[in-house]
Amino acid sequence: MASHEQSYKAGRAEGRAHEKGEQMKESMKEKAEAAKQKTMETAEAAKQKTMETAEAAKQKTRGAAETTNDKTKQTAGAARGKAEETKETSGGILQQAGEKVRNAAQGATDAVKHTFGMADADEDEHNYPATVTRKD
């Protein structure tokens, strides 16, 4: 009878061991599923954070580009205005210089005419009033 009882105890022990193995197997499955879920959540959070960071960088770059564009337009406008002002100023200076050269040339011409006696009496009187002698 001892062998029957031993067989019974061995069967019970085997059943408990099998049950314990199944419990451990189920527990491992649950833990693996939980780890898988946690990994997926972490990956999704990382993906979301990456997208947010990329969008923020994109917005910042867009803002910087707009600011640069605005500053470039302002600088170009100021340069355009300064160029117009310089053009007007230099045009006036060139005109004045041209008039001075023309007047100097006219004065030289009149002096040469007067020196060689080629000037009319009216020209002499107009250009050299103190030196003209009238014959009345």
UniProtKB/Swiss-Prot annotation:
Residues 11-58 have a biased composition (Basic and acidic residues). SUPFAM superfamilies: Apolipoprotein A-I. One of its GO terms (cellular component) is nucleus. Disulfide bonds: none annotated. The keyword Repeat applies. Keywords: Repeat. LEA 11-mer repeat repeats lie at residues 31-41, 42-52, 53-63, 64-74, 75-85. It comes from the Eukaryota. Residues 1-108, 117-136 are annotated as: Disordered. This is a SET 5a protein. Belongs to the LEA type 4 family. LEA proteins are late embryonic proteins abundant in higher plant seed embryos. There are two subsets of LEA proteins (5a and 5b), the first ones are expressed when the cotyledon weight reach 80 mg and the second set are expressed above 100 mg. The function of those proteins is not known. This is Late embryogenesis abundant protein D-7. It comes from Gossypium hirsutum (Upland cotton).
